[in-house]
């Protein structure tokens, strides 16, 4: 293999690893309800840090990854969509490891009272 070929292969593997969704259990989505602690609308991916009551009723912070801001904007999200203290209900694809986290589905996100977080345009 040439040096250029090896460099391309290494770059392609790194890019694929960055964009991999293998860590999320897409076959078993779950709903989480909690209080937004932090909302980051930044590249390369947006994040919601959500305080959720654990099995023992103690708060656990879930780290939820979203799409990139450009994709989220097309779904109606912005840097002002959520703020700390908002109570939300999110459909997520949980981490396969069982750690408190996952990927949230922007079109299946509501405030705790059932109002949609964003209205489709």
Which role does the model predict for each range below?
Residues 16-30:
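Short boundary/loop segments of OB/S1/cold-shock single-stranded nucleic-acid-binding domains
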Residues 55-67:
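A short macromolecule-binding patch
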Residues 73-90:
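Short nucleic-acid-contacting surface segments enriched for D/E, G, S/T with interspersed K/R
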Residues 66-74:
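Short, structured beta-strand/loop micro-motifs enriched in basic residues and often containing a Trp
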Residues 32-36:
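Conserved hydrophobic positions within beta-strands
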Residues 42-53:
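Short aromatic-glycine-enriched beta-strand elements
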Residues 95-120:
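OB-fold/S1-family single-stranded nucleic acid-binding modules
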């Amino acid at each position: 293999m040439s040096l250029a070929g090896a460099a391309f292969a290494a770059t392609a593997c790194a890019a694929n690893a960055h964009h991999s969704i293998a860590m999320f259990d897409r076959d078993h989505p779950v709903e989480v309800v909690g209080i937004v602690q932090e909302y980051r609308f930044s590249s390369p991916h947006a994040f919601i840090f959500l305080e959720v009551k654990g099995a023992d009723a103690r708060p656990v912070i879930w780290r939820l990854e979203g799409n990139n801001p450009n994709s989220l904007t097309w779904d109606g999200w912005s840097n002002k969509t959520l703020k700390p203290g908002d109570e939300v209900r999110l459909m997520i694809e949980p981490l396969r490891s069982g750690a408190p986290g996952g990927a949230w589905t922007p079109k299946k996100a509501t405030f705790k009272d059932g109002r949609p977080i964003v209205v489709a345009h």
